[in-house]
Amino acid sequence: MSISRRNLLAAGSGLALTGALTACGSNTGRGDGGSGGATGGSGGTGGGDLAQWYHQYGEPGTEQAVRRYAAAYKKTKVTVQWRPGNYDQQTAAALLTDGGPDVFEVNGPTLDQIRGGQVVDLTDLFAGVKDDFNPAVLAPKTYEGKIYSIPQVVDMQLLFYRKSMLKKVNLQPPRTLDELVNAAKELTEAGDRKTKGLFLGNDGGAGSLGGTPLYAAGLSLITEDGKVGFDDPSAARALGKLRQLYADKSLLLGAPTDWSDPSAFIQGLTAMQWSGLWALPAVQKALGDDFGVLPFPKEGGSGKPSVPVGAYGAAVSARSKQQAAAKEYIKWLWIEQEEFQTDFALSYGFHIPARVSLAQKASKLKDGAAADAVRFATDNGYAQPLLWTPAGQSAYQDALSRIIKDGANPDTELKTVVRKTNEELQRVKKKSS
């Protein structure tokens, strides 16, 4: 089982992005590439060559690309390892030994890895370029003002809609959550039992949306000063409207493929679908111009449109005996080599370069829905906070599922989640004191 970028996002949305960024397999467009053994040499941290680890991607050509990038670096020989299996567990274990990588790709680093001194501070590498990185994806890689990994590319989720289906019932693309609820109901009623109004996933949306509705209500999972960000009546109102979608029977459930695959949307089983940027090329190929994309609509007077974003990053092991050389290499690759960064983002899948300037220049992202997506990621993107722990994620995910599918009281459910999240934040603070 290899982690995927799609999973990274599920985690960023509030789904146990750590357990599922959140899936195994191919949910992000860069998923499971098979189950062979690790290739490309052993761990590093000794002298001479630098050892670099990547999780095993499923997109054809990616492995060859990263080996080509490494070979182009002339100051030091870089040996790439392509790691199948549970990559997060492998790197967590390797960071505790002298046989791990010098440089490694990471969905993080985690708070424990940062506070445990297992990764190297990379803040100095961002001099003069920090403002060119999407701040939403840089934030979870930052702790107490220091940056611990360089974002490689950005992935995101967004709402797809069929222009012709909305036009048929005289609807505009929904800009508020109320409009989304109403549009989904009208589209379902007009669908002659063949087409549902909205597809959020076969579980009704708890797994795919996560914290997105909270951000759309102007809230957050964790505030910038480290407090619970959704202890507010508007949180319950927002989640109650997800229940309304389910109760109205406006949601497609039991589709042959889940939310991360655009097949249900392409086949006309749903007029609107929550999915990811990775799905855009397939949708465009099948539907031409008969679709558009939107962020999750805002909720309430203090709300704002919202999209979850996430990014794998490049980090340096604190066990490396070549930290200076490792830092110099990843600065060269992920900050200086703009051509490689754009190639990695767009030649083997469909992703956004982590540098805002590169995203704006990329020809594949300049027009239509792709350009809209880049704008949403820049203007409306949020990422899973570093302090949003697995225990808090799990409590929220379970509560959201009960609210949507069982009609549980949102206020009651969220009070329990707020209490659990507060306990987690206190635990984290005690550990750091």
Regions found by a protein language model. Give the residues of each.
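Short helix-initiation/N-cap motifs at beta->coil->alpha
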Residues: W82-Q90, D178-E179, G254-S263
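Long, aromatic- and glycine/proline-rich binding clefts that accommodate carbohydrate-like moieties
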Residues: A136-P140, L294, A345-D398, R402, ...
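Conserved N-terminal structural module of periplasmic/extracytoplasmic solute-binding proteins
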Residues: S2-L111, G300-S302, A325, T412, ...
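Hinge/lid segment of periplasmic solute-binding proteins
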Residues: G108-Q157, G292-L294, K364
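Glycine-centered hinge/linker elements that transmit conformational signals in sensory
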Residues: A184, K227-G254
